[in-house]
A protein has these predicted regions:
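Positively charged
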Residues: 1-142
Length: 142
């Protein structure tokens, strides 16, 4: 699956709320395939040209989490931590970004259930990075 160019205006656009539909599962599946093709641990819908608030994080070894209309807040025990981040939209760029290392992510799953889960370390980083994409923020501007 082709990703949008790093200069595509959709990467600077706040995404529309995702309305769960029959197409949600196919979109999620396509995004997981794209993640595998690009060896990524996260992908947001705008990175494939879709203006909708849906992201996927995970890996074949850990499983994938589809997050619809996600939000996050800092967990009580969180500390700011520097992470070396990459992004499939910026394939030749890695930056050190400071982010909370423990968050509570809230999202709707493909069954329409609103859930909250704790994400730590690299998974907290990935959740925040993909949420940034859904809010029109790319890591090169942080």
């Amino acid at each position: 699956m082709k990703l949008v160019d790093k200069n595509d205006k959709i990467l600077k656009t706040v995404c529309d709320e995702h309305i769960l539909s029959e197409d949600s599962e196919k979109l999620s599946y396509d995004m997981i395939i794209a993640m595998k093709e690009h060896d990524a641990i996260g992908l947001a819908a705008p990175q494939i040209g879709e203006n909708t608030s849906l992201m996927v994080i995970g890996h074949e070894d850990t499983g994938f989490v589809v997050c619809i209309n996600p939000t996050w807040e800092i967990a009580e025990d969180s500390k700011d931590e520097e992470f070396l981040e990459g992004c499939v939209s910026f394939p030749d760029l890695e930056l050190t970004i400071t982010r909370p290392n423990s968050i509570i992510g809230t999202f709707t799953n493909l069954e329409g259930v609103r859930k909250s889960s704790t994400f730590m370390g690299v998974w907290a980083q990935a959740f925040q990075h993909e949420c940034d994409h859904l809010n029109g923020v790319t890591f090169d501007t942080l």
